[in-house]
Design a protein with these regions (language model features):
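Short amphipathic alpha-helical "interface-anchor" segments enriched in bulky aromatics
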Residues: 129, 404-441, 488-531
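Short, charged amphipathic recognition helices of the HTH superfamily
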Residues: 118-138, 514
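Dynamic "connector" segments at or just before major functional cores
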Residues: 2-117, 134-140, 144-149, 156-201, ...
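Short, hydrophobic/amphipathic alpha-helical patches that form generic packing surfaces
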Residues: 107-119, 540-551
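Polybasic low-complexity intrinsically disordered regions
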Residues: 127-130, 156-367, 372-385
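An internal, acidic/charged active-site-proximal segment
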Residues: 343-452
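Basic, amphipathic alpha-helical segments enriched in Lys/Arg and hydrophobic/aromatic residues
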Residues: 503-565
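Low-complexity, serine/threonine/proline-enriched polar segments
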Residues: 160-164, 242-291, 406-480
């Protein structure tokens, strides 16, 4: 059997991709113009201290010049960002042309993209902006020599973007079982991700299947805060003033730890062990495993797994919704949410799925893949309501360990239906129109197949089975839709767990998640360099936007230099 080619090699052999997306064929459509959402008002500012103008891509005619251009350099030449100006102005909360003369928000967007992709800190970026070696970048960003933003100006830019991302209060209502409904605020910085994804489509880089049969996967990522951990038990109350009349409660003492008495002047406004610059940061010990249940590296007994394993994080969690292109083997971030590290993932992930339709009206959702952390009812129900297939790893429960209960409830610990005598059903395909999976017993009891679970006091093979009649050639037929007959949906999946189809879908999604993880590792964004939830949120949205944009440039480069002979 021939080895599976790498993603780069596979794309180089994709004649349709090379024919449509190499520079020779795409140059007549350049520049790709940033799409401005309909209804977005123009920027109220009429003058700026800098001014971005698209400067063309004439140097790309020389193929030798490509060797010296990074993916970021190609982005500056392939895309006209003028349409982004009103979007950023709205996200910055600008409503009037009065007041100070700001820098062009597109200039700052490009400057921060330069910082992120070059893995520089803020001070180094501003220093390089004034360096004569980088005069061409300064010109393409739209800055005048000697007129640059300060570090404080960049901090203010990020703070404003993060604050106004959800300042409208628009929210998605998520219904929970046996709990009050939750309102998940919509992050309008997602307009940046939508614009970048639309540029990928305009360039013709997506395969037709990627959009018509969308495979999406949420995958939370922990980020250490810029502030260093002082107390793992810190809560909102630690940032409230204290007095002798109303002493501040100590969450650490509630956990029978030493804690802080908060009886000194240093603790008057805020506990001295808190982190005021990252007041929303929280501590979590992540002991879960991203390994699927069928992975050979997963521990057989989770209780015997190495003690103390896992990751400790004091900070935040980004939650992207990734679109994986299974044909051309790359991914983009469709939507993103950002929260504290200890926040639950299933509810905001469900909200992101509901937001796909308003942000991407023509995207056809086919399959949603996720690890066991998303295997809760609210997320599984949302996928079903959106008429997509559930390929979410199984979330274990104590009841799964008792095999004697499997025939009574009607399914095993992997969601495979069982007959009342403990024989496993055989999968017979997914009915997308009726949104249910069909199973049949195939008269396993008459074919010498061992039952998965034996019942005490029952003779095998059982003679009293009502489906052994010759008039029923397939035996008992069972259709499983949203739930099993006992009302549970925890183990209901629309692709048999562990089957080749399951593994193919799951691996595609995991590759997308690992690809984003590798990008964040390379850009050194696992520990945030900015303080506070607003700045951290804005920086994460910018990073995912630039990840998509540099992916566009990288794929155009590959198509341009592909040898399809």
């Amino acid at each position: 059997m021939a080895a599976d080619p790498s993603a780069v090699a596979a794309r180089a052999q994709d004649a349709a991709l090379v024919r449509a997306c190499s520079f020779v064929h795409v140059q007549d459509r350049l520049p790709l113009c940033w799409p401005t959402p309909s209804g977005t008002p123009p920027s109220p500012k009429r003058a700026y201290r800098s001014h971005y103008v698209y400067l063309g891509c004439n140097d790309l005619q020389d193929r030798q010049s490509w060797q010296h251009l990074s993916d970021f350099d190609l982005v500056l030449r392939l895309i006209d960002f003028s349409g982004l100006r009103p979007v950023l102005a709205q996200r910055l909360g600008w409503t009037s042309g009065r007041g100070w003369k700001p820098f062009d928000p597109v200039s700052l967007f490009l400057l921060l993209g330069w910082q992120i992709s070059s893995v520089w800190n803020r001070a180094q970026t501003l220093k390089n902006l004034d360096d004569p070696r980088y005069a061409d970048y300064r010109q393409r960003f739209g800055f005048r020599q000697g007129v640059y933003p300060t570090e404080g100006g960049l901090r203010y830019f990020l703070t404003s973007l993060g604050h106004h991302s959800d300042s409208t209060g628009d929210a998605v209502r998520i219904e929970l079982d046996n709990e009050p409904a939750v309102q998940v605020v919509i992050q309008y910085l997602n307009q940046l991700l939508v614009g970048a994804a639309q540029l990928i489509r305009e360039a013709g880089l997506f395969s037709p299947e990627a959009w018509a049969q969308a495979l999406v996967c949420p995958d939370g990522m922990l980020h250490d805060a810029a502030s260093r951990l002082r107390c793992a038990a810190v809560k909102d109350s630690c940032y409230q003033p204290t007095s002798t009349q109303a002493p501040r409660p100590c969450p650490a003492k509630e956990k029978e730890q030493q804690g802080c008495d908060c009886d000194t002047l240093a603790c008057a406004d805020t506990c001295r062990y808190a982190t005021p610059r990252d007041a929303e940061a929280r501590f979590i010990h992540y002991s879960g495993s991203n390994q699927p249940r069928h992975s050979p590296n997963r521990a057989k007994d989770e209780s015997k797994a190495k003690q103390g394993s896992g990751r400790k994080c004091y900070g935040y969690r980004s939650l992207p919704l990734l679109l994986a292109d299974p044909v051309r083997r790359f991914h983009v971030t469709l939507l993103l949410d950002f929260q504290t590290a200890n926040g639950r993932e299933d509810v905001p992930a469900a909200a992101l799925l509901w937001q796909l339709k308003p942000f991407y009206p023509d995207l056809h959702l086919d399959t949603v893949v996720g690890d066991a952390g998303f295997g809760f009812d609210v997320f599984l129900r949302t996928i079903y309501q959106l008429q997509a297939r559930r390929v979410v790893d199984l979330r274990a429960h104590e009841t799964d360990k008792d095999k004697s209960q499997w025939p009574l409830r009607g399914y095993d610990d992997r969601g495979r239906p069982l007959c009342p005598f403990g024989y496993a059903f055989t999968a017979n395909g997914f009915d997308a129109q009726r949104q249910r999976y069909k199973w049949f017993c195939g008269k396993a009891c008459q074919r010498g197949i061992e039952p998965v679970a034996r019942l005490k006091g029952t003779t095998y093979p059982p003679a009293e089975c009502a489906y052994q009649d010759a008039a029923l050639p397939h035996g008992k037929i069972l259709n499983v839709g949203e739930r099993f007959l006992d009302g549970s949906r925890r183990l209901v999946r629309d692709v048999p767990v562990g089957s080749p189809a399951w593994k193919a879908l799951y691996h595609r999604a995991r590759n997308a998640s690992e690809g984003r993880n590798a990008t964040y590792e390379y850009w050194d964004l696992k520990r945030l360099s900015v303080y506070g939830l607003c700045r951290a949120k804005a920086f994460s949205f910018l990073a995912d936007t630039w990840s998509t944009l540099t992916t566009l440039a990288r794929l155009v480069r590959e198509a341009t230099f592909a040898n399809t002979s």
